[in-house]
Amino acid sequence: MGSDFSTVKIRKVTSCSICKAMMSHPVSINCGHSYCKSCIQSYYCNVSPKTGWKMLGCPLCSSPFSLENLRPNKELETIIDMIKGMEEQDQDMVCEEHEEKFNRFCEDDGQLLCWRCYWEDRHKGHTLAHVKDVYQNYKEKLQNTMTKLRELQENHEVQIHFITHQINAWKDAVEDRRQTIKSNFKNLQSFLQEEEKFYLWRLENEEKEMLVQLEGSEANLQQTFERAQCQIQELEAKCQGSAQKLLQDVKNTLSRCEAMKRNPLKADPLKVHTKCNVSELYFDVKTILRRHQVSVILDPSTAHLDLALTKGGRLVTYKRCPRDLQARSSAKRFYGLPCVLGCEGFTSGRYYFEVSVENATSWDLGVCVENVHRGFNMKKEPESGFWTIKMSEEDGLEALTSTPTPPLHLIEKPQILGVFLDYEAGAVSFYSVTTGSHIFTFPKASFQDTLRPFFQVYQYSPLFLPAINNQ
């Protein structure tokens, strides 16, 4: 009864005294009374021509006003909109069969009932309750479900970010492998070019297949994320509405929300499977290289005093030796770093030699100008007469140049290395005989002096130069 009385009072406040209906676009005049904008304008236009007055009296209190002083009453307009919304909700919450207001709820069927539905046989034996009694319980259920959906949404958002990271990481890994494959083929003979295209084609297909999987996972997660957002908006609307609105079809709503389970992300390892195993392809190239193979013997007159040469000058080992001052004074001998040169000198043509490094963890090898500096401040770079590569446990395999270069990639640690020199072409190249792959070629040089094989030996890392007839 009190609620009905309040509604009457609110309607009276929000009604226009001219048209007697709820105000539309309410405006206030000087005295503070409010009217429909169209009503007060019509009133002014009807009365003013008859009297000739620019100022007219308020229809309620006769206080003077003019159209110039009309002010939109936003607060009243907001109240009117709220009343209309409440009335619309109340209209929706009426039993279509009996045209009575819903005020009961059937727990078994999950349906709203009017007082006439309440007494029907179809609900006999069911758990029936007043709307007010079950409202709070179901509101809490909806809110709990909304919390779970938000957690699901947050989880999927994290997974979307993870998938995006996976895509970028996958692209980087593929690009890294692509560069490795390209470098393997860079300086090989022209007949290998078609094979290079084939391997890159396989890699592209592998990349596309994995990206399709990753992007598909990303799209599925995005769809789930958006569905969760829609469910959250629906639940928010229910929780903000009336009790009847909240309970209407509530079990179906909860069932749909519960059906959205969190799917664990399957994070497969991002491993590029395409490998360029050029062992068979490289067989013909090795045959060509070995046409130019020479048997290298180490020159004892150049060996640092801490190096021991054995097996006919083919094995060199780092070993602390007694100092021979006369031997140390030799201009040919390295006295700074533990290095040694091969006996052979190259002034023209092509040469290829192999070095066994299977028992060594660190080494420097290649070719150098015969008269390079032998002291401590030796810079192993082309500008100083060195064309060498270096292996170390800390930095891996790298080319020794005046400017830093990225580490050289190897499929596996080489047991035997091949060094190829084309004097006229100004080329020095390195190959892994173990895997049959190209490692590195220095930029073209212009050789003028005699070149010789160069080796720097480290502790516990002996180097061996196999004879040609033993390979």
Curated annotation (Swiss-Prot):
Chain intervals annotated as zinc finger (RING-type): 16-62
Consequences of knocking out this gene: Mice are more susceptible to death triggered by polyinosinic:polycytidylic acid, LPS and S.typhimurium. Increased TLR3/4-mediated cytokine induction.
GO biological process: innate immune response; negative regulation of defense response to virus; positive regulation of canonical NF-kappaB signal transduction; positive regulation of viral entry into host cell; positive regulation of viral genome replication; proteasome-mediated ubiquitin-dependent protein catabolic process; protein K48-linked ubiquitination; protein sumoylation
InterPro entries in the record: B30.2/SPRY, B30.2/SPRY_sf, Butyrophylin_SPRY, ConA-like_dom_sf, PRY, SPRY/PRY_TRIM38, SPRY_dom, TRIM/RBCC
Record GO terms (molecular function): transcription coactivator activity; ubiquitin protein ligase activity; zinc ion binding
Localisation per UniProt entry: Cytoplasm
Pathway this chain belongs to: Protein modification; protein ubiquitination; Protein modification; protein sumoylation
Full protein name: E3 ubiquitin-protein ligase TRIM38
Species whose genome carries this gene: Mus musculus (Mouse)
